C-alpha cells in the first residue's frame, strides 16, 4: 500500500513544493515579515523533513518541537490559513492531485495547535 509521501512523489516532489511555497510566502504581506531574518535554506531543510515525516515518509525531522520553534512568533489563525492556502496552491502547481493535496492539508491541519503554539 502506498503512502501519501509516495503518492505525492517522495522527497523530490516535497522539495519542489516547499520551494514553490517559499516563493509564495516571500510575496505575501502577512507572512513575509514573519520570515524576515530567517535562514531560509535552513528553514527549507526543516520544512522538507517535517512534511516528509507527517506525509508518512522517512523520519527525518530533527528540529525542535513545533511549539518551541514557533514560541514568541504570535502566530494566529490568519497566518495558518495563509500558509495552508499557499501550500495547497504550491502542491497543485507541482502536479499533486486534489485528493492527495486534501490529505496533505488535513495532516497539516492536525498539527495546527503545535504550529500556532496554542
Swiss-Prot record:
One of its GO terms (molecular function) is metal ion binding. This is Group 1 truncated hemoglobin GlbN. Heme binds at residue 70. Monomer. The keyword Membrane applies. It is found in: Membrane. GO terms for cellular component: membrane. It is a peripheral membrane protein. Belongs to the truncated hemoglobin family. Group I subfamily. It comes from the Bacteria.
